[in-house]
């Protein structure tokens, strides 16, 4: 029976011709299937995270076109996802508009923050601050330091829940936690910093026990608490910062534009050095950390 049939004894030309015939049968059968529908949803959180992605690419490669893509997209978001005084979860809807959820607001606030850090345009910082005020008013949980997924103004048919587990997308609360920590620095507002730290403390034990489900939380904890980078606030246009020869790796120093100081202010974690007026003095302060 095996004579001429066992594939181990067939020559390559014969075997390949049989294989092509079988593939054609499978291909013809596949073409008869109904194709899947195309997902054309335009969702606020996805677009806001793409803004942040464009900014990160710009920071890595230094391409101005990536920054322009981020600016164009944030303009489109403000045009299509904002109707009057309401932010929308989706740009298009069938009957009634769907109000934005916590992940939409959190991702948009963080996108504004990253735009401010890159452009020094204080308009973005104020827009982020306005969103955080709204979140505190409409999404705060009555008992936890975390925030509910839906607004208090939302349809009560939507289940109340607190989303904390990171998956393909970072959880809404972890994104918000990072936004609070950034805005605590940018606005010199201790309340925001305390909010972010309280959120971390409520999740940390679970995150350590199940790290695969809390990846973004653990990244934030590492970058902000366990191994914080040096944060340098500067006034003006930051002339001389880019080319200065620091005593530490540039990746460990984050330069932050500020319209609230007139000198340089270096902070690491909870500690801030005395304000100084030259980069050389900042470098001496950094040397004390080594």
Where does each model-flagged region fall?
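Glycan-recognition and catalytic cores of secretory/periplasmic carbohydrate-active enzymes
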Residues: 1-290
